[in-house]
């Protein structure tokens, strides 16, 4: 398979995770050029993990800053959920200067089915097997650990569902009090809560990749990168209102949205009654536009477990990283100890825009404003004309002109 054709499945799989992979730095992204994804991990481990294998003591390159290079023996002895890649050795520059490991697992860049695994020496820059040196381009095995991100600092700004001029109407209903001795009405008002969310994800998340959105440690819903999430939930709010006997109150449920689970917190607003003649409540405020801002912050793996690319069973990970070379008698020269998972200092900003629900009548707001301007303009002209006529009549009466003349 050509290198160019291998780039797309590599990218699609590398970024397959709860929210998607985001590059930690520009330096790491250059490693992925002309890389190949190891799709048959079980077969690979079966070939290199034998008891008599001469490859157990050599290293596997890590592409994640939180993970140090580890040996093939450590790779074979621990459950792995990372992505395994074959990367051209030239992408790493001079490995001898890094001083992490003297040898890495490699293979020739020729026919995938017949490529023989070899031991790449960082000093001599040659990859050898029991049968001699491997000619041509060399690929090194590397691990790419998932980077998990969590939505934090959710800030609610505004929300709108325009059925009247700026009034966020969620539902409306009628309360009737048929009891002559009872001045309170207890009634449930139901409404549909629509939610439309469009995620603007980092450019490194491939379009069409399945994503899962978590609220804390609970999966809220699933969507696909590049698509808009939509849901309609039937909700009920309990209304207890003071009402005079035999009266009727029209109520409107207006809403705001909570920070946690995007639930509407509705309140009742009295519109009018047939007895007391209430007008619009002064507490009904106009809510315009819609924008929810949040930050995408990298957090610990246990918040959202990585996707296991080659096993049907979900992975079980401890909160901390497995110690490299733990319990192994063979340790590479210059091997660095493992580091714990830490949150990235940089925050990736994501804007979650609540799409406009649309008005009950398209263009209602503009039409209403235009009609109001026209109405008051005509009213103003009419009032001015009435004043002018009144003044003219008084003047004619005082001067005995027109119909007020003696002749």
UniProtKB/Swiss-Prot annotation:
Glycosylation sites: 52, 78, 161, 250
Disruption phenotype: RNAi-mediated knockdown reduces oocyst formation by 50% following infection with P.berghei but not with P.falciparum.
Membrane topology designation: Single-pass type I membrane protein
UniProt topological domain (Cytoplasmic) ranges: 388-407
Location in the cell: Cell membrane
GO CC annotation terms, alphabetical: plasma membrane
Extracellular side: 25-366
Designated name of the protein: Enolase-binding protein
Record organism: Anopheles gambiae
């Amino acid at each position: 398979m050509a290198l160019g054709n291998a780039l797309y499945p590599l990218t699609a799989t590398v970024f397959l995770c709860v929210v998607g992979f985001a590059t930690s730095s520009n330096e790491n992204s250059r490693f992925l050029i002309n890389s190949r994804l190891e799709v048959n991990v079980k077969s690979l481990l079966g070939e290199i993990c034998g008891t008599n294998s001469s490859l157990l003591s050599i290293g596997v390159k890590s592409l994640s800053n939180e993970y140090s290079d580890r040996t093939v023996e450590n790779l074979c002895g621990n459950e792995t959920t990372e992505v395994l890649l074959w990367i051209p050795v030239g992408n790493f520059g001079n490995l001898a200067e890094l001083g992490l490991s003297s040898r890495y697992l490699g293979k020739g860049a020729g026919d995938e089915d017949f490529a023989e695994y070899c031991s790449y020496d960082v000093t001599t820059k040659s990859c050898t097997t029991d049968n001699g040196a491997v000619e041509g381009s060399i690929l090194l095995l590397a691990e790419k650990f998932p980077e998990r991100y969590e939505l934090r600092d959710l800030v609610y700004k505004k929300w709108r569902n325009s059925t009247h001029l700026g009034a966020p109407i969620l539902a409306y209903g009628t309360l009737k009090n048929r009891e002559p001795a009872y001045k309170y009405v207890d009634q449930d008002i139901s409404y549909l809560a629509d939610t439309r969310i469009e995620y603007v994800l980092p450019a490194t998340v491939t379009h069409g990749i399945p994503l899962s959105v978590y609220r804390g440690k609970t999966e809220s819903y699933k969507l696909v990168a590049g698509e808009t999430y939509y849901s309609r939930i039937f909700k009920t709010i309990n209304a207890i209102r003071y009402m005079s006997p035999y009266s009727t109150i029209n109520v409107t449920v207006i809403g705001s949205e909570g920070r946690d689970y995007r639930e509407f917190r509705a309140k009742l607003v009295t519109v009018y009654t047939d007895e007391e003649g209430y007008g619009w409540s002064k507490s009904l405020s106009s809510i315009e536009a819609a924008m929810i801002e949040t930050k995408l912050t990298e957090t610990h793996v246990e918040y959202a477990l990585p996707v296991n690319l080659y096993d049907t069973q979900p992975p079980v990970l401890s909160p901390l990283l497995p110690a490299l070379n733990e319990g192994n008698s063979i340790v590479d020269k210059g091997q660095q100890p493992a580091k714990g998972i830490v949150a990235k200092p940089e925050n990736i900003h994501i804007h979650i825009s609540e799409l406009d629900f649309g008005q009950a009548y398209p263009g209602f707001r503009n039409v209403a404003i235009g009609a109001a301007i026209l109405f008051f303009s005509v009213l103003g002209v009419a009032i001015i004309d009435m004043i002018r006529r009144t003044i003219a009549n008084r003047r004619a009466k005082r001067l005995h002109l027109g119909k007020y003349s003696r002749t």
